[in-house]
Amino acid sequence: SHQEVVPTSLRQQGRGGLKTPPLSRIRSLLGLILLGALAWAFSVDRSKVAWRVVLWGVGLQLIFALFILKTPMGAGIFDWLNTVVVALLGFTVEGARFIFGDLVYNNVPMGVGEAATNAPIQEMPGQVARTGASFAFNVLPTIIFFSALMTVLYHLGIMQWVVRGVAWVMQRTLGTSGAETLSAAGNIFVGQTEAPLMVKPFFETMTMSELHAVMTGGFATVAGGVLAAYVGMLLAYFPDIAGHLIAASVMSAPAALVMAKLMYPEDGDPVTKGQTNIQLKSPDVNVIDAAARGAGEGLGLALNVGAMLLAFIALIAMANALLG
């Protein structure tokens, strides 16, 4: 089981077991101030910065963090989300087993234990040897499954309701336009390719500040499939990791708008100012079509992730060899 192979020091770093030293909190505060100052310093027009967006954006992050960490209701939601994601990872294992059979390492933490294969890599640490196979047969299939699941939820209209709710809160507090806010909220759940498609009809009329906010929101969060992949990689070490990552993704949405509006303040008149009731239509005919399209998109993302890891790790190894 996980508890038998994971060091105690790592198992204790869940939501209740990890204590943040005061110095780390001060460092985080200084980092927040420094990053904000840098964004303001590089702003295209510092005189037009809307400080309402900045103050409310930071405030929303603090409010959400306090709700999750300091209230029983928030902690309950946190734990429930963690349980749901972990259960979904179990469903991924069933699909991966059908394709890969015994190559799927169920209930074995990635990166822990002896070498997983008899390949000539026994001189490498067992942690490294196990990681590759587990990543390929456990983590990458997770991206495919979650991509299909999110596409189905969008087709059924469930995710639209959630995204509109988050967008409504941010739009009412930050005062940003409906299109950029909706895209930022969508990035919490889907990737930076899919989220902007929600507001595609407004691209031609968007201001430069709005387009900048849409791009920033994409880089500030991760797609649902990638988030699930991170959960699969870290679950053995941090039992509450899913809740942590979901909380971080939600908090990153207003943070992205803060940074975007500091660097490129709004100087125009957005068409969707004050609107969040934008129709989000699914292009799929039925649930099967949605699942198939989502799986195909997830496959492309999984292949890209695997290819990038292979290429960059190999390049880093080559650089290390050249540097001696």
Region annotations inferred by a language model:
Residues Q171-L234:
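Alpha-helical membrane segments and immediately flanking helix-loop junctions
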Residues G296-G324:
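Transmembrane helical segments that form the transport core of multi-pass membrane transport proteins
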Residues A41-D45, I121-T131, M170-Q171, A195-T205, ...:
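Cytosolic juxtamembrane amphipathic/interface segments immediately preceding
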Residues V250-L303:
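Long, contiguous bundles of hydrophobic transmembrane helices that form the permeation core
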Residues I143-S147, A242-M259:
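Alpha-helical transmembrane segments
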Residues V163-M198, D269-A290:
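Juxtamembrane inter-helical linkers in multi-pass membrane proteins
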